[in-house]
Every structure is written in structure tokens, then in C-alpha cells.
Amino acid sequence: MALYPGSFDPITNGHLDLIQRGSALFDRLIVAILRNDEKRPLFGLEERIEMLREVARDLPNVEVGSFGGLLVDYAAESGASVILRGIRAVSDYEYELQMALMNRRLRPEIETVFLMAGEAHSFISSRLVKEVIRLGGNIGGLVPSSIEGRLKRRLLEETGEA
């Protein structure tokens, strides 16, 4: 079983691609949202759980959870032996390598597996999606269509603009 962690604020087509590919590689995949009280997410935890369940509803071996604290502790508690991470660029690799090595030091029995982002998704990040939509750009193809509608509604709620 594998664990795919992230903030997923919002979920992008890059995340969805990794979820689909991870679902095909592992008999069970937990998509785990990090609860971070220091950040002010665009979407609350329950909203992100709902969105992830919605986009993964056709993947019966995928479940959605959330955690606070150390990722490797949550992985161990969940019975996951693998942490799945996506790599978009060299800069991602440098950060992810440090995290993987620290996780290995803390819990040597849990492996980290890196998947390269699909070519169509290698430039997508939640941060960029939020920036593009706030500046009035088109995010079609960057996020699942159901998420695009939610993003536009949330932006309208926050700013009065869409």
C-alpha cells in the first residue's frame, strides 16, 4: 500500500494524473491531505477531502485521509510501506530527496517512490493555478472541470471578481 501526501489546494490535473498512475501501481493508495494550521488554504480541509473523493470516485482502491505531524508516522499508522511523490523538475527532486532521506532516517521500513510528472502536467502547481485564476487567466485543462467551477466560485466569494 502507498500513501500520496499533499496539500491539494486545489487539486490539479497533475495531482490527478499521479493518483491514477499510483492507483494502477499499488493495490491500495491513500491520498493524504496535510493539516497545516499555519497556512491559510483557499479550501478548508473538508472541502479538499470532498474534492479528492469526487475526482477519485472511479478508482476503487483509492481512499482519502488527512494527517498532522510527521508523514512517516501517519504512513506507519495507516499500514503504508511506500510514500509516493511526484517530480516535475530538478528543483522538486532536490527538495524531495532531502525529505525522502529524512523520512528514511525516521522510519527505514518506509520507502519513497518518485514518479515523473506526465509531460502535459510537468509545469502545473496549485500555487500557479491560483495565481493564474486570480489574474483572470484561463485554467481550463489545468484542473478537473468540477474543481475549476469551485475555484471560480471561491474567488468570487473572496474578491467579488471571477
Identify the meaning behind each predicted range.
Residues M1-A162:
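Nucleotidyltransferase catalytic core that binds NTPs
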